[in-house]
């Protein structure tokens, strides 16, 4: 899909928009605990340079329910984070904050269950809406990291 968005310094630009389902980012240490091995198994590349979906999945469990087959994304991070939707949060019985990735203050506690072990961590968030673009494109368009941009999506719900 391609959508238009307006950058005040440039005008109308076209970008591809992707939707990210629930997923998790893990540290190498937590991954080794959950899976009993040290390396992620590459499944497919993501749109973000250097990022990938792994073959590995976990179960996430909250006070009221659980969700299976939550994809682990790579590479390893310096923090553990589970990104869910508002609907997922309701099913799990949690009230996670809307946050930028990596900002875990107030994150909901979730149990992450792998094939070898499990761990409970304050790691559940709803990811704030954001756009991934290359440094070169950001420079060309005159935007910097974390700068708000206006996005207009054509369609019935415009």
Model-based region annotation:
Residues 2-9:
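Short, positively charged and aromatic/hydrophobic N-terminal segments
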Residues 9-10, 29:
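Intrinsic disorder/low-complexity segments enriched in polar/small residues
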Residues 13:
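Catalytic domains of riboflavin
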Residues 16-63, 68-115, 120-152, 158:
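Short beta-strand-centered segments at strand-helix junctions
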């Amino acid at each position: 899909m391609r959508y238009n968005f307006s950058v005040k310094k440039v005008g109308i630009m076209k970008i591809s928009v992707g939707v990210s389902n629930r997923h998790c980012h893990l540290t190498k240490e937590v991954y080794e605990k959950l899976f009993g091995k040290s390396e992620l198994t590459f499944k497919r590349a993501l749109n973000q340079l250097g990022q990938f979906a792994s073959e590995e999945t976990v179960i996430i469990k909250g006070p009221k329910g659980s969700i299976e087959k939550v994809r682990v994304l790579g590479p390893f991070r310096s923090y553990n984070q589970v990104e869910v939707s508002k609907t997922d949060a309701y099913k799990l019985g949690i009230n996670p904050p809307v946050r930028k990735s990596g900002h875990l203050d107030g994150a909901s506690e979730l149990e992450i269950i792998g094939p070898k072990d499990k761990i409970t961590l304050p790691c559940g968030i709803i990811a704030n809406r954001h756009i991934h673009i290359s440094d070169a494109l950001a420079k060309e368009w005159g935007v910097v990291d974390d700068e708000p941009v206006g996005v207009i999506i054509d369609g019935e719900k415009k």
